[in-house]
A protein has these predicted regions:
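Conserved anion-binding
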Residues: 3, 65-157
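Structural motif
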Residues: 24, 76, 124, 176-178
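Short secondary-structure boundary segments
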Residues: 33, 85, 110-111, 133-134, ...
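A C-terminal functional module that forms or caps the active site or interfaces directly
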Residues: 54, 144-177, 181-188
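C-terminal helical cap(s) of enzyme catalytic domains, especially alpha/beta-barrels
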Residues: 95, 99, 175-176, 184-206
Length: 206
């Protein structure tokens, strides 16, 4: 299980500081939607470069114009990009093709997708599907139960991530559930000592 640390709602300078504090422990650094909207993808290249070889995900939440947005994101240096599960099949297919062309990775955000929708879009075998409880909704009460229920319902989906209010005490149990990525944000990025918080979370995953 990989640890993805999400950076959101901070100035560019603070984003750079956070990146430098987590590169030794995070497996994936997420440049959150708020930053991609405020600064645009091209302007975020210095932040990507500060990651020093750690994979960087751009949480661009593509809904349309899949090829254009994904091509741009990969050219800017992102390794992973996100598309909404609610996007059209045409958009999802365009994003998948772009990911293949650029040797990139696609994450499908399942925010507000019901079971019928998930079933319909479950055929992207190289994609990572992200169980996502929104910031506005609040945190997931039991992420382990959520993962187990999802895997029982959709055994055909082989690559899974989870996001939304994940805390350090969830990690040991989640690491036993054979998921690809756990995504954490403020539990790490708002800590007094970000590097120490990230290190402590990694230890819980072993």
């Amino acid at each position: 299980m990989k640890l993805q640390v999400a950076i959101d709602r901070v100035p560019m300078e603070r984003a750079m500081e956070i990146v430098k504090n987590i590169t030794s422990e995070a497996n994936i650094i997420e440049i959150g939607t708020s930053l991609t909207k405020e600064f645009d993808m091209r302007a975020l290249r210095p932040v990507i470069e500060a990651a020093e070889g750690v994979a960087v995900l751009g949480d661009i939440k593509t809904c349309d114009e899949g090829k254009y947005e994904f091509d741009l994101g990969y050219r800017c240096g992102f390794s992973y990009l996100t598309v909404m599960g609610s996007a059209s099949m045409g958009t999802l297919e365009a994003c998948a093709h772009s990911a293949a062309e650029h040797d990139g990775l696609m994450m499908i955000d399942l925010l507000e997708c019901d079971e019928t929708r998930i079933e319909r879009i479950s055929g992207f075998t190289d994609a990572i599907y992200c169980l996502h409880t929104s910031t506005d909704e609040g945190s997931t009460a039991d992420p382990v139960a959520q993962v187990r229920a999802f895997k029982t319902r959709f055994p055909q989906i082989q690559h899974l991530a989870i996001a939304g209010g994940i805390k350090k005490h969830h990690l040991a149990a989640l690491s036993q559930e054979n998921i690809d990525i756990v995504i954490m944000g403020s539990a790490i990025t708002k800590a007094d000592d970000i590097a120490m918080a990230c290190r402590a979370c990694r230890k819980e995953m072993k």
